[in-house]
């Protein structure tokens, strides 16, 4: 007798990784999953429903969920049969990039409200049921910026560092209840949203920022960032494939990076526990040797660094 499908609740499915993951799980050939694909604004569900095709209403349902609202989370769980979630995928997130002096505290708080407290809110909601049943899997879409700081991404990186520390700590306790936590750590992901964001910040004023810092951001960081996305970036489909493997694993890993081409960029931090090697090298590459940085990024795009296909 086949096992009953596992209920998978995914946040942030209007586009990008969340959308691709929901569709891939819903089209699982063995029909192992019943996907609840959520988003804050149901007015944006059209792309997901089109991509889901015949799976819509069968192995995939769309629901409203604002991870920043206790009421919205409760309403969403009430719509799930039995209110029981077998796999929770914390994917909803927002970005923030730019010179620190030009960013408002309200914008910073919004990043933490969504990226960190939104994930915590969902976990608190599903954990009692998972503990009672002594089974469950919590997947967190983190980032390599949860492993290393990146210039002009201080607030976003801080939110991901918070997620990494929180869920690593929680993982120890939850093993006692046969509940697994997996932190999935993508590098740059090429989406329409990212392209628009880079264009918007390239002309933003960032009031309160000194001319030198603004010049560094526009003339050094933004070109390097575009080069990074072009040479090292993954598609949402590729990241989703890795997450599907993680969800289907008999013993899910605590951490899984999705892009081996990014590995050399985080190796410097591992090589020097003091952190000085990473900070000084990053500083020199961005501010003194930008041409060398661009050359290095192009080298990372060669086939020897391509992301492998993880075995089933």
Curated annotation (Swiss-Prot):
Molecular function per GO: all-trans-retinol dehydrogenase (NAD+) activity; all-trans-retinol dehydrogenase (NADP+) activity; estradiol 17-beta-dehydrogenase [NAD(P)+] activity
GO cellular component annotations of the record: cytosol; photoreceptor outer segment membrane
Membrane topology: Multi-pass membrane protein
Catalytic activity field: all-trans-retinol + NADP(+) = all-trans-retinal + NADPH + H(+)
InterPro entries in the record: 17beta_DH (IPR011348), NAD(P)-bd_dom_sf (IPR036291), Sc_DH/Rdtase_CS (IPR020904), SDR_fam (IPR002347)
Subcellular location: Membrane
EC number: 1.1.1.300
Summary of the function given for this chain in its UniProt record: Retinol dehydrogenase with a clear preference for NADP. Converts all-trans-retinal to all-trans-retinol. May play a role in the regeneration of visual pigment at high light intensity.
UniProt-recorded name of the protein: Retinol dehydrogenase 8
Organism ancestry: Eukaryota, Metazoa, Chordata, Craniata, Vertebrata
Record gene name: RDH8
């Amino acid at each position: 007798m086949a096992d009953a499908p596992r209920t998978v609740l995914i946040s942030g499915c209007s586009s990008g990784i969340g959308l691709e993951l929901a569709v891939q799980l819903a089209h699982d050939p063995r029909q192992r999953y019943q996907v609840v694909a959520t988003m804050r604004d149901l007015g944006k569900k059209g792309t997901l429903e089109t991509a889901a095709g015949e799976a819509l209403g069968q192995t995939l349902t769309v629901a409203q969920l604002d991870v920043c609202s206790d009421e919205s989370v409760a309403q969403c769980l009430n719509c799930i049969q039995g209110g029981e979630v077998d796999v929770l995928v914390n994917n909803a997130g927002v970005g923030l990039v730019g010179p620190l002096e030009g960013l408002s505290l309200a914008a910073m708080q919004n990043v933490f409200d969504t990226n960190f407290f939104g994930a915590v809110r969902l976990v608190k909601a599903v954990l009692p049921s998972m503990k009672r049943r002594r089974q469950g899997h919590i997947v967190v879409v983190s980032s390599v910026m949860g492993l290393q700081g990146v210039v002009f991404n201080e607030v976003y990186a801080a939110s991901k560092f918070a997620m990494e520390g929180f869920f690593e700590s929680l993982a120890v306790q939850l093993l006692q209840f046969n509940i697994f936590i997996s932190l999935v750590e993508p590098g740059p992901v090429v989406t329409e949203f990212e392209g628009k964001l880079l264009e918007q910040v390239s002309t933003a004023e960032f009031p309160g920022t000194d001319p030198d810092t603004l010049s560094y951001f526009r003339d050094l960081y933004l070109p390097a960032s575009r080069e990074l996305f072009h040479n090292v970036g993954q598609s949402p489909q590729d990241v989703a494939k890795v997450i599907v493997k993680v969800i289907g694993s008999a013993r899910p890993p605590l951490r899984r990076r999705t892009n081996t081409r990014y590995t050399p960029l985080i190796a410097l931090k591992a090589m020097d526990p003091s952190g000085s090697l990473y900070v000084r090298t990053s500083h020199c590459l961005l501010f003194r040797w930008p041409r060398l940085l661009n050359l290095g990024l192009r080298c990372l795009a060669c086939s020897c660094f391509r992301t492998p296909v993880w075995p089933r």
